Structure formats: structure tokens, C-alpha cells
Amino acid sequence: MNYVIRSVRADEWAAAKALRLEALQDPVAPLAYLETYEEALGRPDSFWQERTTSGAAGADGAQTVIAEAPDGQWVGMVTVLIEEPGTTDWAGFPVERKQGHVVGVFVRPEERGSGLTDVLFDAALEWAWAHGAERVRLIVHEDNGRAQRFYRKAGFEPSGVVVPLAKAPGQSELEFVLERP
């Protein structure tokens, strides 16, 4: 099937919300996302509007890329954030280089293994490189082997940075990085 790979538009917040809620109900969601379905469901529409606008086409600090089926249905998404040197990231670590940070990766189960995730990642990486990122990173749960295998196949390597999970004592996430080609 042919999909349109594109940046989300600011007015598509309801579709972005629906796909995120679907992602948070996936069986691997506890390993893939810090946010729970219940937390996301309780957020007001204004949250989803702002979140979508901040990652929409034309935004400088973030970009959400979607895969849209011919019938208009969204079947996958990925967001990349730009982190500037001299700032602190979400986990409290200093950001030393301009970098992209991939978050919110989701492809519907029936599309997994089809190559769609590769295409979404290519678009996200292209955007990050075009916005001056020196490297792109992502954080993956230590027990999420499937995701780790995909990220390695995409060229990402473990950096050695381990992030303890505050919500799950005794569990950690691992940073994977891809240097700019």
C-alpha cells in the first residue's frame, strides 16, 4: 500500500490525539512511553492543540511526521525535537551539542515489518539534519529488545548513557545515538 509521509498540520490535533491514544494502548506501551493511556486521556484538548502545533509543518523546534493511508487514516508517526547546546534535557542531563531527539515512535501493528518505520525515520532524520542537528538520539527501555534491534538496524548505537526511570524504580532506559553523516 502507498502512504503519504508528511509533517502533521496544526489543525490535525484530533487525529494526532487519536493515534497517540492508540499507541498508548499497544501491549508494548509500558516499555515504549513514559506517559500512560489514562494520563493522556485526561489531558484537555488545549494540550493536544499545543502539542500538535509545536510539531507541525513549519515549526523549528520539533516536527511530527505521519504516515497517511490513501483513505486518510494515519498508520504511523514519529516526532523529532531539536535540543540546543547549553540547555538541559527532559532527564536533567546537560545538552552539549545541537541534536535531534526522536520520541513518540508508533506504527500500527498490522504495518510493523513493512518498512514503514524506516520511511518515517528517514523523514525525521532528514528534518533533523536540515535543522542543523549534529547527531540524533533516542531513549529506549532496557527491556524493549524489538525497538533496540530496529534502532541498531537504522544506524543508531548505544552511547553508554543510562537513564533511571523515576516511575519504575530499578528499571532504566538507554540512550542510542546516530552521528550526522
Give residue spans per PLM region.
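Acetyl-CoA-dependent GNAT
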Residues: 18, 22-110, 121-123, 127, ...
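A short beta-loop-alpha structural element at the N-terminal edge
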Residues: 4-18, 30
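C-terminal "cap" of GNAT-fold acetyltransferases
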Residues: 134-137, 141-148, 152-181
